[in-house]
């Protein structure tokens, strides 16, 4: 499972990094976090968390600095968080999280992306009840049992710890993600491959042939939208 999360980050960086989309999206997220609090990660935990994730995605320093400098200025640009839910082929389900300065534009774009790529957008709650929100932490290691004990001793609400292919994956209650990261740091973990709040499907479906091709095109269309921050789904192997 650790390899799965690391591969997701690597594939996203490889796909989006070529045209700087991932950098632009992180720029918006960093700006919003810095604007809502202090533009200093030491006194702004939300900003610190975003910067940690930006580092994992290899976002260049100049992009980060530009977003923080923008937040320090007098700009009044406002971004709104949103969530959209929908369906793809053969039982596939999708959740899309957005950060946008124009909600009407975003809703129209996503509806078009679903409609043109074999899917359809559903009502709020039509999909999310089949997913669970969890903190996901991945780092190099192989001893799941000792990590589990370490987190329990730190009073972290840890749901599961898995070790596979040289990586440890920790699942926490969403409210304990940040505390879990700090507990692991205190225990000697210096670098993290993944630190994310994720929507984990309660069950997965397997797609093949044309269904898989259609689904991949749908995911690409959604992720290519500038206002989309995250896309979650229940398809195995992707």
UniProtKB/Swiss-Prot annotation:
Any coiled-coil regions, as ranges: none
Gene3D superfamilies found in the cross-reference section: 1.10.10.200, 3.30.70.980
Entry's Gene Ontology cellular component terms: cytosol
An annotated Gene Ontology molecular function: DNA binding
UniProt keyword annotations, A-Z: Cytoplasm, DNA-binding, Transcription, Transcription regulation
Biological processes annotated in GO: regulation of DNA-templated transcription
Highest rank taxon of the organism: Bacteria
Subcellular location(s) per record: Cytoplasm
Pfam families: TACO1_YebC_N (PF20772), Transcrip_reg (PF01709)
Keyword Secreted among UniProt keywords: no
Entry-linked SUPFAM superfamilies: YebC-like (SSF75625)
HAMAP family: Transcrip_reg_TACO1, Transcrip_reg_TACO1_YeeN
Family: Belongs to the TACO1 family. YeeN subfamily.
Protein name: Probable transcriptional regulatory protein SMU_1789c
Source species: Streptococcus mutans serotype c (strain ATCC 700610 / UA159)
């Amino acid at each position: 499972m650790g390899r799965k999360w690391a591969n997701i980050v690597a594939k996203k960086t490889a796909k989006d990094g070529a045209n700087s989309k991932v950098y632009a999206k992180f720029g918006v997220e960093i700006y919003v976090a810095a604007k809502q609090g202090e533009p200093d990660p030491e006194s702004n935990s939300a900003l610190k968390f975003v910067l940690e994730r930006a580092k994992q995605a290899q976002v260049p320093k100049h992009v980060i600095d530009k977003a923080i400098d923008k937040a320090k200025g007098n700009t009044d640009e406002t971004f709104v968080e949103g969530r959209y839910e929908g369906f793809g082929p053969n039982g596939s389900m999708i959740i899309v999280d957005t950060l946008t300065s124009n909600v009407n534009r975003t809703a129209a774009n996503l509806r078009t992306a679903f409609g043109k790529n074999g899917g359809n957008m559903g009502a709020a709650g039509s999909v999310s009840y089949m997913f669970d929100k969890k903190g996901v932490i991945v780092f190099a290691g192989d001893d799941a049992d000792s990590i589990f004990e370490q987190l329990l001793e730190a009073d972290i609400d840890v749901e599961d710890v898995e070790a596979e292919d040289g990586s440890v994956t920790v699942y926490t209650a969403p409210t304990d993600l940040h505390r879990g990261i700090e507990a692991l740091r205190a225990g000697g973990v210096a670098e993290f491959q993944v630190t994310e709040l994720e929507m984990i499907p309660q069950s997965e479906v397997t797609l093949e042939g044309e269904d898989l091709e259609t689904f991949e095109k749908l995911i690409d269309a959604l992720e290519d939208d500038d206002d989309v921050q995250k896309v979650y789904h229940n398809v195995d192997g992707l």
